[in-house]
């Protein structure tokens, strides 16, 4: 079986002839690669695509990222406000600039950002550890306090890349699990986390009086 290598974008990468039934997404520290295989005129054409995200990086947040993070926090808050205007105030953020400056240096509450010339996504995390508890087993947990993708970058797998980065980070520091909360009615977020393999741990009940 012969293989023709077709260039799409800036790079041309020779690939071994393998059986590929669909596309695959490959990530390194600087770029996302999409590789497709298609049978054309009885030959296999391997189409190499350089992702739109050419200079992407997921890393710990820095002071310079604060304006972008605040913009994302506004987007998150508006989602929550639309869901529960009886609980959330509009046009505000969970953290202010000074609070973010402190959080950025807190290793127990790491903030990660997805950068592509601008901050396109963030993940606020908290590391907690239970030891010698009367009821609970010893356990180290990474809690995702907030994860957001810029509304202009949604549908481009930014959230998936962020989540997988956080998952790998949690494993690297010896966490036993990852937890987070999803508001009822936020169906898109619930579906996303289920697709990432997460399952319901507990349910918070409410009655409004």
Language-model segments: residues:
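Conserved GNAT-fold acetyl-CoA-binding loop/helix
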Residues: 78-100
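A short helix-loop-beta-strand connector motif used in the catalytic cores of GNAT acetyltransferases and
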Residues: 98-112, 143
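Conserved beta-strand-loop-alpha-helix junction that forms the acyl-donor binding cleft
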Residues: 179-189, 206-209
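A short beta-loop-alpha structural element at the N-terminal edge
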Residues: 57-71
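Conserved acetyl-CoA-binding loop of GNAT-fold acetyltransferases
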Residues: 175, 194-203
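Conserved acetyl-CoA binding element of GNAT-fold acetyltransferases
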Residues: 137-151, 206
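Conserved glycine-rich acetyl-CoA-binding loop
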Residues: 146, 150-164, 171-173, 184-191, ...
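Conserved beta-strand in the GNAT
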Residues: 113, 118-127, 148
């Amino acid at each position: 079986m012969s293989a023709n290598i077709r260039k799409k974008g800036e790079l041309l990468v020779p690939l071994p002839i393998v059986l590929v039934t669909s596309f695959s997404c490959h990530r390194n520290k600087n770029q996302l690669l999409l590789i497709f295989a298609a049978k054309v005129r009885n030959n296999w054409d391997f189409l190499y695509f350089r992702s739109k995200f050419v200079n992407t990086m997921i890393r710990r947040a820095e002071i310079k990222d604060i304006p972008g993070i605040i913009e994302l926090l506004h987007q998150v808050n508006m989602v929550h406000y639309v869901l529960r205007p009886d609980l959330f105030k509009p046009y505000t953020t969970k953290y202010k600039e000074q609070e973010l400056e402190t959080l950025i240096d807190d290793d127990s509450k790491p903030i990660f950002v997805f950068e592509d010339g601008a901050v396109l996504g963030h993940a606020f995390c908290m590391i907690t550890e239970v030891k010698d508890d009367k009821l609970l087993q010893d356990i180290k947990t990474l809690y995702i306090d907030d994860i957001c993708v810029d509304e202009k970058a949604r549908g481009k797998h930014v959230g998936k890349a962020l989540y997988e980065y956080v998952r790998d980070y949690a494993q690297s520091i010896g966490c036993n699990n990852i937890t987070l909360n999803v508001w009822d009615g936020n169906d898109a977020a619930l579906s996303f986390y289920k697709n990432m393999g997460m399952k319901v741990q507990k349910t918070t009940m409410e009655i409004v009086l």
